[in-house]
């Protein structure tokens, strides 16, 4: 057998024996649907699990302590590059958010970013409406559903780039100058808000 034929045969064998390296880790659940295992309560409020969803209520009003930015749950570990998918629902006149790569010092909405969640279906998109990176960049469209209906969001963070897809529409594509590694968080902004989260999954890139 010539060297060329042997090399070709060896290549074919290795192709079947050695699995390809995946582009990123397989998605995993951040919420088991039963309890708050894997999550840490920050700054009070009431967090519970009901009917397969995390519910946040009786939050700490941020105006009494701006450094805390309301009550929130955070992940036990920090994340850098990832695709985060979840569903959320907010009550009438409610205010909540999703913290992305936030630190524990000062306000997590400004160490990392906060994806805003509001009861604002049909409103003009601004830097503080649903899907926006709060006080930084508005969504291109307000894709939020009416109060108490479930919304599906996908957030992709890779390096300095943050992309958000809400209810099937790409609405944010932004280059950040803030932390590129930190905690993920679920925020309940104040005592009036009742926010729900479910089907929380992450794939690290």
Predicted regions and their residues:
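Positively charged n-region of N-terminal signal peptides that target proteins for export
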Residues: 1-5
């Amino acid at each position: 057998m010539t060297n060329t034929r042997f090399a070709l045969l060896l290549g074919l064998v290795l192709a079947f024996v050695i699995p390809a390296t995946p582009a990123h880790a397989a998605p995993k659940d951040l919420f088991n649907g039963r309890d708050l295992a894997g999550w840490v309560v920050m700054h009070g409020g009431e967090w519970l699990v009901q009917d397969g969803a995390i519910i946040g209520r009786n939050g700490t009003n941020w105006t009494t302590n701006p450094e805390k930015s309301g009550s929130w749950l955070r992940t036990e570990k920090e994340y850098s590059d990832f695709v985060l998918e979840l569903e959320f629902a907010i009550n009438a006149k409610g205010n909540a958010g999703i913290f992305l790569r936030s630190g524990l010092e000062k306000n997590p909405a400004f160490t990392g970013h906060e994806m805003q969640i509001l009861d604002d279906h049909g409103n003009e998109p601004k830097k503080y409406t649903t899907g926006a990176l709060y006080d930084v960049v508005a969504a291109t469209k307000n894709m939020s559903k009416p109060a108490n209906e479930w919304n599906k969001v996908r957030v992709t963070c890779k390096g300095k780039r943050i992309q958000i897809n809400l209810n099937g529409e790409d609405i944010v594509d932004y280059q950040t100058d803030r932390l590129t590694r930190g905690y993920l968080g679920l925020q309940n902004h104040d005592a009036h808000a009742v926010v729900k989260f479910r089907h929380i999954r992450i794939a690290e890139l």
